[in-house]
Amino acid sequence: MAPAGHPGAKRGILERLESGEVVIGDGSFLITLEKRGYVKAGLWTPEAVIEHPDAVRQLHMEFLRAGSNVMQTFTFSASEDNMESKWEDVNAAACDLAREVAGKGDALVAGGICQTSIYKYHKDEARIKKLFRQQLEVFAWKNVDFLIAEYFEHVEEAVWAVEVLKESDRPVAVTMCISPEGDMHDITPGECAVRLVKAGASIVGVNCRFGPETSLKTIELMKEGLQRAGLKAHLMVQPLGFHTPDCGKEGFVDLPEYPFGLESRAATRWDIQKYAREAYNQGVRYIGGCCGFEPYHIRAIAEELAPERGFLPPASEKHGSWGSALDMHTKPWVRARARREYWENLLPASGRPFCPSLSKPDV
């Protein structure tokens, strides 16, 4: 199948999902831009949209070229409680960058908010909703296409976020960073999904904290909860680009490798093709990634689901399906790897003879 850019005119997120179209999200910004020298670990705030706009623009472009058709604003932790006086300029600049790149393809712009830094200590609903509302006002001013509330570990705060975002006329998606065990108050994934849909979310799911396998288990529990309650919503999954079977309820932040030693846990492109197919088979139609999800991972989703989408992304022009380009290699043992069976069954080594395959979480 030849690369074909994108089909037709832009449609809204719900129109796409309701027609059965696969929507491919973007991937890692904080972790990737930290590695590239544009984000400081710790607070993980997105000043880069002002300080280094070219770096953010380039990453958006890489995801677009790889197959993403949602450009999410780089506004993680960009509320006033984290950024003080800079928050408004950062949110506005992030919207402008996302819109600029989205205009180069068949991509929508999603304005994103996340859990606040104050909820754990002061469950002040009015104050927290004010923080969400401030960001929403910028997103409305910049005319984003839809809204995403992501990375919530407490469903109560996620519900507050949805309630605020529903004050606009834009569709609302919400994803929680929880495992199959549920949120930090032991509310099950199924019950979380029910509460979020009742609050007004049209799209629900999970993002970050856990790898693809764990995230898909959580999504299945959300799906079952909605079915039991007789509720309908579109499903969305954006996991880590890392393998994390050994992490606890808090996710990868508990692992001793977080955040500077995660490279040995990176998913291969073939792992991600498997994830994309499994997500699709579960009924998920909004499929993307979060921390550690590089552009080549997004391309893997787009390639795996090209039969359903009807086209390949531009980045596939230089990438043979399942290693087929290796047919041209001069070494016969490398040419022998130009087949799907080889890559699907490979168990990659770390190259570190004294490394364990799993770690013990710190919490």
Swiss-Prot record:
Its EC number is 2.1.1.10. The modification Phosphoserine is found at S321. Binds 1 zinc ion per subunit. The keyword Transferase applies. Coiled coil: none annotated. One of its GO terms (molecular function) is S-methylmethionine-homocysteine S-methyltransferase activity. GO terms for cellular component: cytosol. GO terms for biological process: L-methionine salvage; methylation. Its cofactor is Zn(2+). Pfam families: S-methyl_trans. Transmembrane segments: none annotated. It is an enzyme of class 2 (transferase). Keywords: Metal-binding, Methyltransferase, Phosphoprotein, Transferase, Zinc. The keyword Zinc applies. InterPro entries: Betaine-hCys_S-MeTrfase_BHMT, BHMT, HCY_dom, HCY_dom_sf. It catalyses: S-methyl-L-methionine + L-homocysteine = 2 L-methionine + H(+). Pathway: Amino-acid biosynthesis; L-methionine biosynthesis via de novo pathway; L-methionine from L-homocysteine (BhmT route): step 1/1. Residues 11-305 form the Hcy-binding domain. PANTHER family: BETAINE--HOMOCYSTEINE S-METHYLTRANSFERASE 1, S-METHYLMETHIONINE--HOMOCYSTEINE S-METHYLTRANSFERASE BHMT2. Homotetramer. Involved in the regulation of homocysteine metabolism. Converts betaine and homocysteine to dimethylglycine and methionine, respectively. This reaction is also required for the irreversible oxidation of choline. This is S-methylmethionine--homocysteine S-methyltransferase BHMT2. It comes from Pongo abelii.
